[in-house]
Amino acid sequence: MKKESKYIIQEFSSSIEQSLLEQIYFLNQENTPEVGDLSSIKELQNLLRQSSNNYYVIFKNRIIGFMICFREKSDYNSKNYKFFKKKESKFLYVDRVAINEKYRRFGIGKNLYLKIESIAANNDLPICCEVNTDPLNEISIRFHKDLGFTEVGKCKFDNHSVVYLRK
């Protein structure tokens, strides 16, 4: 993709067209362990029903990226989400961001974050997320620090570890 190529960032919900939902699911699976594994498209739909702000990135009629976010009142059962729910009275939690490997380094991730930064600013919300430290996702850690995120905690799970970030 050339820098001047046009991609579109589109908001979506759990009622998204099935073919687009499938593309998001497969992109998610291609990006594990950087994002959490989903057992099925149905699990993705359940995730979307609980979420608040979701965007996909489309280029030449294919989804090349997406972002799924939650607000503080969700019933989302993620331990990482619950970390922030205990610490913040209100917040916007970035659960997952995935960009097709071919389309990385074109500013897509940054533009997705710009979308939610305006929502966060208009609602006086911190943006919260976690990034893997084991296995190490150094690119994502650097990306978030460059965007102004700071570390607010860490957690070691049985099969991986994360750093918690806030902006």
Stretch-by-stretch model annotation:
Residues E4-Y7, K154-K167:
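C-terminal "cap" of GNAT-fold acetyltransferases
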Residues I68-R96:
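Conserved acyl-donor/pantetheine-binding loop and adjacent beta-alpha core of acyl/acetyltransferases
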Residues K2-K42, F59-I64:
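Short amphipathic alpha-helix that is part of the acyltransferase structural core
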Residues A120-T133:
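Conserved GNAT acetyl-CoA-binding A-motif
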Residues T133-G153:
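Conserved active-site alpha-helix within GNAT-family acetyltransferase domains
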Residues I99, R105-S118:
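Conserved acetyl-CoA-binding loop-helix of GNAT-fold acetyltransferases
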Residues D95-R104, T133-D134:
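A short, internal acetyl-CoA/4′-phosphopantetheine-binding micro-motif in the GNAT/acyltransferase core
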Residues N53-R71:
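Conserved beta-hairpin
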